[in-house]
């Protein structure tokens, strides 16, 4: 998901019984996506332990300090960056997670249309930008040049 999509989530977007979440994306796009069990459990833990009960805010992710309002996309990016630093990953932005997910799916054998569907891209050309491969991966799948070394 994009940082802006995470920031826009409301409590009403989580459909617990159906195991789904409604995501409002770019271009007024609205999709109901599967909610993996581990993600649902993490959201439950967040709501129980961290979500301020004193707020009237319907946003799923709310600032923990006053004013108790919805996180912005910049706030989501800040949370991701702080978690990456704590994990020893250095500087990592929220959008980098989309690039990494696309690359990992590609390496696992997913097709560009499949990756585009997961990332919810309208155009394959957009997915191709995200699905970057490294030179080593290209060497492994490239056919040897005739007369060259294998």
Residue ranges and their predicted role:
Residues 1-3, 31, 48-52, 98, ...:
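Short, cationic motifs built from Arg/Lys/His that form the positively charged side of catalytic pockets
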Residues 1-42:
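Conserved tyrosine-mediated DNA breakage-rejoining catalytic core shared by Y-recombinases
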Residues 14-16, 72, 89-91, 110-129, ...:
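Short, polar N-cap/turn motifs at the start of nucleic acid-interacting alpha helices
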Residues 19, 32, 56-57, 65, ...:
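A cross-kingdom feature marking solvent-exposed beta-strand/loop segments within repeated
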Residues 25-45, 58-79:
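C-terminal catalytic core of Y-nucleophile DNA break-rejoin enzymes
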Residues 33, 77-117:
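Short, basic (Lys/Arg/His-rich) helix/loop patches that form interaction surfaces
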Residues 46, 132-150:
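DNA/chromatin major-groove-contacting recognition/catalytic segments
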């Amino acid at each position: 998901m994009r940082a802006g999509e995470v920031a826009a989530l409301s409590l009403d977007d989580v459909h617990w019984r159906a195991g789904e979440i409604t995501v409002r994306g770019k271009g007024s796009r609205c999709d109901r996506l599967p909610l993996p069990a581990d993600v649902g459990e993490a959201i439950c833990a967040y709501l129980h332990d961290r979500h301020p009960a004193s707020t009237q805010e319907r946003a799923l992710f709310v600032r923990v300090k006053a004013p108790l309002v919805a996180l912005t996309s910049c706030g989501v990016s800040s949370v991701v960056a702080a978690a990456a630093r704590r994990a020893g990953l250095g500087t990592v932005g929220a959008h980098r997670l989309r690039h990494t997910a696309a690359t990992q799916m590609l390496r696992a054998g997913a097709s560009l249309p499949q990756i585009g569907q997961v990332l919810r891209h309208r155009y394959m050309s957009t997915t191709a930008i995200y699905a970057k491969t490294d030179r080593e991966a290209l060497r492994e799948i490239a056919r040897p040049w005739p007369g060259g070394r294998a």
